[in-house]
């Protein structure tokens, strides 16, 4: 509510879709333009195309080292972003600066990212989108699960539910642990109800081929993949299917396990998991516990959320706390 109130004060009109809030214009650039307009109104100096190479605390504040010149500052807010999507400007250099100032970094991995599958059984079904539940299984244990539109690609799996569980897979792979994803391609049915459905479909249609057995349920590109994994030939007649074969088909559909080889890289990730340890930050001000008047905010810290605006909210909330605290501290020191 505070975030909405802040942006409303800048002139942003919003609308809600379910539990999510969007600019009424449906343009992300509207938010950026309003922020830039407010900076102009407040006569805030903005310097671009400068690379910060280091920050040195002094007795009166900080010296900022850049590829152009040295600058002085009373306070520093590090809000450099992580390593995700570096073409937008966040190349991970903020981590090095924070480490030089004494902070500890939790290993960083891509998050909200696509997954590459080893010996991909659905490569020939690339382009298919289907409702599914995906579960990250890390080191033999379920870690996270999500339900939504699964996208099959030539190299692996994608889509919002895959993004939601990807951080757990990435962490597991970083630790050299086994990482798999269990896919339920028919979450509307239990194993028992799907088995009964297939039994009824078999009875009375004994001359139907297995190529047509799953028509009306799944995308045509998925059917041969399922049958292949269940070791059922496409031209087999349904009347020749045993109950054991049907149970095998049910398992392929309801508990399809793929092994993850790796994630896509940071440039394909929406955010990072990992970053500067939050234990080294005062939570109500975002000030460093090690360096006075140094503040850290946003994705630079070891906090990441699922899709749905949570990472944006973290950036805005911590930025607000850091900015307010920095201004108050500087004013009180003068």
Listing of model-derived features with the role each one plays in the protein:
Residues 48-61:
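A conserved short coil-to-beta-strand element within the FAD-binding core of flavoproteins
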Residues 52-53, 70-90, 98-99, 150-158, ...:
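Short hydrophobic core segments
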Residues 13, 104-107, 113-240:
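An anion/pyrophosphate-binding glycine-rich loop and adjacent beta-alpha core
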Residues 82-101, 303-330:
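A conserved FAD-binding loop/helix module that cradles the flavin
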Residues 18-37, 85-89, 118-120, 238-245:
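Short beta-strand to alpha-helix junction loop
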Residues 47, 65-75, 145-148:
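Core beta-strand elements of the Rossmann-like FAD/NAD(P) dinucleotide-binding domain
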Residues 47-48, 224-304:
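A glycine-rich dinucleotide-binding beta-alpha-beta segment and adjacent secondary-structure elements
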Residues 1-45:
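Conserved N-terminal/central alpha/beta ligand/cofactor-binding core
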């Amino acid at each position: 509510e505070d975030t909405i109130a802040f942006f409303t004060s800048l002139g942003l009109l919003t609308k809600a879709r379910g539990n999510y809030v969007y600019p009424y214009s449906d343009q992300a650039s509207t938010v950026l333009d309003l922020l830039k307009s407010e900076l102009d109104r407040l006569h805030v100096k903005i310097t671009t195309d400068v690379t910060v190479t280091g920050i040195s605390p002094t007795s009166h504040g900080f010296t900022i080292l850049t590829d152009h010149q040295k600058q002085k500052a009373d306070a520093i807010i590090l809000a450099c972003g992580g390593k995700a999507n570096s073409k937008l400007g966040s190349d991970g250099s903020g981590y090095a600066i924070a480490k030089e100032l004494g902070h500890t970094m939790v290993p960083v991995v891509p998050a909200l990212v696509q997954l590459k599958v080893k010996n991909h059984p659905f490569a020939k079904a690339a382009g298919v989108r289907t409702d599914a539940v995906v579960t990250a299984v890390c080191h033999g244990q379920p870690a996270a699960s999500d339900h939504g539109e699964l996208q099959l690609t030539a190299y692996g799996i994608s889509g919002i539910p895959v993004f939601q569980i990807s951080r757990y897979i990435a962490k597991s792979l970083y630790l050299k642990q086994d990482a798999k994803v269990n896919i339920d391609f028919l979450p509307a049915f239990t194993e028992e109800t799907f088995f009964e459905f297939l039994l009824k479909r078999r009875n009375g249609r004994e001359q139907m081929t297995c190529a047509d057995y799953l028509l009306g349920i799944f995308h045509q590109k998925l059917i041969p993949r399922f049958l292949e994994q269940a070791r059922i030939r496409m031209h087999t007649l349904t009347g020749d299917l045993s109950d054991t074969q049907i149970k095998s088909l049910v398992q392929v559909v309801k508990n399809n396990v793929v092994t993850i080889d790796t994630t896509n890289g940071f440039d394909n990730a929406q955010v990072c998991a990992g970053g500067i340890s939050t234990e080294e930050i005062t939570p109500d001000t975002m000030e460093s516990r090690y360096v006075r008047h140094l503040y850290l905010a946003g994705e630079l810290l070891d906090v990441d959320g699922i899709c749905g605006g949570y990472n944006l909210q973290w950036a805005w909330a911590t930025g607000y706390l850091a900015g307010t605290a920095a201004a108050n501290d500087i004013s009180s020191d003068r």
